[in-house]
């Protein structure tokens, strides 16, 4: 084994010199340059000061503007709540721990931080999958005479929480466990060991296939069908510049959505799978820390892609920030006037 395993921790360094210590009790500066902990803390601070305001503003603006409280927007609000879970429950703890060089909150704190951060991440991940399903259903209408309503939206939100809890509760009750990961300043699922009594192998397989591959397949299928439907509508109205413009915007948006999902989860899932299938191989603390950066950054670019680029949300946010007036209203109206012929296609687009 090219690491040191202890009670509820795994440090990616062989303890041949006797320097390895518990990440719950001692600074881990022997793992990487101490400056790396400062960089980690600064990055967490950056995510907090940008991630919290933009997600909180999303919720506040929705309360302020009744027209935003529509069933199709429920999942976007759920996405903002998920990001706030990550910011409040995960990023603050990681920043505080990085300032000390180790996970200072102990075993209980590791469980709470691992649960909160993973819960937020899983709600966010499943929200993107449900959002893809909702947009596919609304635009492609696979079922005739179907009308998307509040009950369907509530079912979608409930599904995200059910799947997220199905992923995050088991490590608290003995199916796998939360342990410090990477630079030992944040906690996550134990991909590193085959600790006796925790059945890590079965849980990691369950996580990878059910909570990564399934949402990925859903997103590719739904957005693939949606793009086909939009292109067919555009082909039927080739003389309409409006329809062509809407098609380009929807295509751009779908590409952004898929890339956003892959950038967020593919590095983390790939590295976790590699560690799981190559247990005993040598890898440094940064090997898991850097992919986690991508997953955590979703708290910023998810709102930008899915909320701030949504014309209705964007206008309401600007109106709220400018005390009831939108200084860009003329430009927005001029841009939107060219899209009236393609309302069904542009309903999937945030622009």
UniProtKB/Swiss-Prot annotation:
GO biological process entries: absorption of visible light; G protein-coupled opsin signaling pathway; visual perception
Modified residues (N6-(retinylidene)lysine): 296
GO CC, alphabetical: membrane; photoreceptor disc membrane; plasma membrane
Cytoplasmic side: 62-73, 134-152, 225-252, 309-351
Maturation and modification: Phosphorylated on some or all of the serine and threonine residues present in the C-terminal region.
Record bears the keyword Membrane: yes
Region (Disordered): 330-351
Transmembrane stretches, start-end: 37-61, 74-96, 111-133, 153-173, 203-224, 253-274, 287-308
Motif residue range(s): 'Ionic lock' involved in activated form stabilization: 134-136
Extracellular side: 1-36, 97-110, 174-202, 275-286
Disulfides per UniProt: 110-187
Residues the record marks as carrying a glycan: 2, 15, 200
Keywords: Cell projection, Chromophore, Disulfide bond, G-protein coupled receptor, Glycoprotein, Lipoprotein, Membrane, Palmitate, Phosphoprotein, Photoreceptor protein, Receptor, Retinal protein, Sensory transduction, Transducer, Transmembrane, Transmembrane helix, Vision
Comp. bias intervals (Low complexity): 335-351
Function: Photoreceptor required for image-forming vision at low light intensity. While most salt water fish species use retinal as chromophore, most freshwater fish use 3-dehydroretinal, or a mixture of retinal and 3-dehydroretinal. Light-induced isomerization of 11-cis to all-trans retinal triggers a conformational change that activates signaling via G-proteins. Subsequent receptor phosphorylation mediates displacement of the bound G-protein alpha subunit by arrestin and terminates signaling.
Protein's UniProt name: Rhodopsin
UniProt organism field: Neoniphon sammara (Spotfin squirrelfish)
């Amino acid at each position: 084994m090219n690491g040191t395993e202890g009670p509820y921790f795994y440090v990616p360094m062989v303890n041949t010199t006797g320097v390895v210590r518990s990440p719950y009790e001692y600074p881990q500066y022997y793992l990487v340059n101490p400056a790396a902990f400062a960089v980690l803390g600064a990055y967490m601070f950056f995510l907090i000061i940008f991630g919290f305001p933009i997600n909180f503003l999303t919720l506040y603006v929705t309360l302020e503007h009744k027209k935003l409280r529509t069933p199709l927007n429920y999942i976007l609000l759920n996405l903002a709540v998920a990001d706030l879970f990550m910011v409040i429950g995960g990023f603050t703890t990681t920043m505080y721990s990085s300032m000390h060089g180790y996970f200072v909150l102990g075993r209980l704190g590791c469980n709470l931080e691992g649960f909160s951060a993973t819960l937020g991440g899983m709600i966010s991940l499943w929200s993107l999958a449900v959002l893809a399903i909702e947009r596919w259903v609304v635009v492609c209408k696979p079922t005739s005479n179907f009308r998307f309503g509040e009950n369907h939206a509530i079912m979608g939100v409930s599904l995200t929480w059910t799947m997220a809890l199905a992923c995050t509760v088991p490590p608290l009750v003995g199916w796998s466990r939360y342990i410090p990961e990477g630079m030992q300043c944040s906690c996550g699922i134990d991909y590193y060991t085959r600790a006796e009594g925790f059945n890590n192998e079965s849980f990691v397989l369950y996580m990878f296939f059910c909570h990564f591959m399934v949402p990925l397949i859903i997103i590719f299928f739904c957005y693939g069908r949606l793009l086909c439907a939009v292109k067919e509508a555009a082909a039927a109205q080739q003389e309409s510049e409006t329809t062509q413009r809407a098609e380009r915007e929807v295509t751009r948006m779908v590409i952004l959505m898929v890339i956003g999902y892959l950038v967020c989860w593919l590095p983390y899932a790939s590295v976790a799978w590699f560690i799981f299938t190559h247990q005993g191989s040598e890898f440094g603390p940064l090997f898991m820390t850097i992919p986690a950066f991508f997953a955590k950054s979703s708290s910023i670019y998810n709102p930008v892609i899915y909320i701030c680029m949504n014309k209705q949300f964007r206008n309401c946010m600007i109106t709220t920030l400018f005390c009831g007036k939108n200084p860009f209203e003329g430009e927005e109206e001029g841009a939107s006037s060219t899209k009236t012929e393609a309302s069904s296609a542009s309903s999937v687009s945030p622009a």
